[in-house]
Amino acid sequence: MHKDEDQRLLGAVPLPNDPDRSLRPQVLDDFIGQEAARANLKIFIEAAKARQEALDHVLFVGPPGLGKTTLSQIMAKELGVNFRSTSGPVIAKAGDLAALLTNLEERDVLFIDEIHRLSPAIEEILYPAMEDYQLDLIIGEGPAARSVKIDLAKFTLVAATTRLGLLTTPLRDRFGIPIRLNFYTIEELEYIVQRNARLFSVQISEDGAHEIARRARGTPRIAGRLLRRVCDFALVKRAKKIDRKIADEALSRLEVDHLGLDPLDRRYLLLIAQTFLGGPVGIETIAAALSEPRDAIEDIIEPYLLQQGFIQRTARGRILHQKAWSHLGLCAPASTQKHPQLFDMPDNASRQTVLWDEADD
């Protein structure tokens, strides 16, 4: 991930030593939002406990900051088992995975974040481990090489990914419980902000909590981060209570607008609007123009803009919707207004209406 993105206020990537970790709920009943996912998990956990068996493998899918890691930790607590955590890029060799799996006890939970970044070789070792609870390793090299099978404790693999499409079908099919997490509503985030304020021993009004919640991009992690910055502002201003005025002033200073867009989002939208006349424009071109890696744009910037209806992804590239033009205070080009079919162009459409076409996008 790009260095600047790691430090971005509205980035949903967890920061090192992030104090918001202390705000995480410890049981499912305290977890706010994701109602359908919580209800289903509660049933699956109770069933596994009643059978005294390991819970089926779980795959969480969704943008960063929605609670995938928190739910994994809660699952281990509810099951009364140990929790082990790692991430896809960390598991570089077969020995790394073997060390993790052989140290698991019966019914333990192993959490792998960013599982889509596992190498194909590691995936091949993971298949029998998930299905048969066995490790099939090759010891030695050349003619002296031999296959060794190691029995494992029956464990639960909980994996998280922001990019479901990058998972191979064999790996994806081995998860018995796939769960998609969605962006939170403003009401849910408002409740989270009020809860966090109580934990901080900070007084906040309903309209103050609402102001923070509506700028949090549907993401609890961002809501907690914004609340901390508003608390800093209120402390320096000697405000006894965070109200809408204090929250608005603080967030405006941080250049977070009323829909939760920050300078990087606006750079993205302005680039497509002003340089490429609303698109279509390929993701590689956008990444080069913004000096940001493609993954950061696809995983961090675009999901919220798509959910809010600012942009559309097409086979030809990214296109701005009317909502984006209005938010930027710009007029859409006449060609966009006259040809709405540009937003839903079939693959066999005339290439003359395409402004920028990139085969590699």
UniProtKB/Swiss-Prot annotation:
Region of interest (Large ATPase domain (RuvB-L)), residue spans: 1-184
What broad class of enzyme is this? hydrolase
Compartment(s) where it occurs, according to its Swiss-Prot or TrEMBL record: Cytoplasm
Region (Head domain (RuvB-H)) residue ranges read 258-361
A GO cellular component annotated for this chain's UniProt record is: cytoplasm
- Tell me the keywords, alphabetical order: ATP-binding, Cytoplasm, DNA damage, DNA recombination, DNA repair, DNA-binding, Hydrolase, Nucleotide-binding
Q: What is its EC number?
A: 3.6.4.-
Residues annotated to bind DNA: R294, R313, R318
Catalysed reactions, as listed in the record = ATP + H2O = ADP + phosphate + H(+)
Taxonomic superkingdom:
Bacteria
* Ligand binding (Mg(2+)): T69
Report residues binding ATP: L23, R24, G65, K68, T69, T70, E131, D132, Y133, R174, Y184, R221
Question: How is this protein organized at the quaternary level?
Answer: Homohexamer. Forms an RuvA(8)-RuvB(12)-Holliday junction (HJ) complex. HJ DNA is sandwiched between 2 RuvA tetramers; dsDNA enters through RuvA and exits via RuvB. An RuvB hexamer assembles on each DNA strand where it exits the tetramer. Each RuvB hexamer is contacted by two RuvA subunits (via domain III) on 2 adjacent RuvB subunits; this complex drives branch migration. In the full resolvosome a probable DNA-RuvA(4)-RuvB(12)-RuvC(2) complex forms which resolves the HJ.
Describe the function of this protein. Answer: The RuvA-RuvB-RuvC complex processes Holliday junction (HJ) DNA during genetic recombination and DNA repair, while the RuvA-RuvB complex plays an important role in the rescue of blocked DNA replication forks via replication fork reversal (RFR). RuvA specifically binds to HJ cruciform DNA, conferring on it an open structure. The RuvB hexamer acts as an ATP-dependent pump, pulling dsDNA into and through the RuvAB complex. RuvB forms 2 homohexamers on either side of HJ DNA bound by 1 or 2 RuvA tetramers; 4 subunits per hexamer contact DNA at a time.
Q: What is known of its domains?
A: Has 3 domains, the large (RuvB-L) and small ATPase (RuvB-S) domains and the C-terminal head (RuvB-H) domain. The head domain binds DNA, while the ATPase domains jointly bind ATP, ADP or are empty depending on the state of the subunit in the translocation cycle. During a single DNA translocation step the structure of each domain remains the same, but their relative positions change.
Instruction: State what protein this is by name.
Output: Holliday junction branch migration complex subunit RuvB
Q: Which organism is it from?
A: Bartonella henselae (strain ATCC 49882 / DSM 28221 / CCUG 30454 / Houston 1) (Rochalimaea henselae)
